[in-house]
Amino acid sequence: SGLKMAFDEVNKAGGIDGKKLRIVESDNKSEPSEAGNSVTKLVTQDKVIAVVGPATSGCVAASTPITTANKVPLIAPCATAPNITVENGKVKEFVFRSCFTDPFQGRVMAEFADKNLKVKNVAILYDASSDYSKGLAEVFTKTMEEKGGKIVAKEAFLAKDLDFKSALTKIK
């Protein structure tokens, strides 16, 4: 990975202040409860000086109270929930994001549908068990309607669903 290559390069050049960098990995199984346990071990036992990850917003949300309490910076490479870096209007001091947010994605999708695809009537199928999916659908709907588009159908499903006939029949 790019991180490993960068660490190798720094270490070959003598490290930082003569100290070699090391990567400590931990699998949180993309489960918030596991993420909390995983980051607790990284911070309290492995004594890491920074955390890169987790991948999902839910896992980052479970990790940030632990990293923040221990003043360990956490870089969220792909957690897109708006409250990852800001909560109640206040910037979280030890949490950083290196990607866009859910509202940005929903807006860009609607703008693309309007400008590039010239779509005016839209049906939305979203995962009601996912804050990510619900957030995208909400912002997409708002932006599309502001641009004069019409949401002709909005149907929810659950991630565990295997049959989408009912929702698709309603949209048709």
Protein language model regions, located:
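Beta-alpha junction/loop-to-helix N-cap segments that form part of ligand/metal-binding clefts
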Residues: S1, A13-V86, F157-L162
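Short, polar/charged alpha-helical segment
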Residues: S1-D17, E138-E146
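Hydrophobic alpha-helical segments typical of transmembrane helices
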Residues: G2, A6, S38, V108-M109, ...
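A generic secondary-structure signal
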Residues: E9, A13, K41, E111-N116, ...
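Conserved donor sugar-nucleotide recognition element shared by glycan-biosynthetic enzymes
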Residues: E31-A35, C59, D102-G106, S133-L136, ...
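A short acidic, amphipathic alpha-helical/loop segment
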Residues: A62-I66, V139, A167
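An alpha-beta-alpha
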Residues: K92-A159
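Short amphipathic alpha-helix with an adjacent loop that forms part of the alpha/beta core around
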Residues: S166-K172
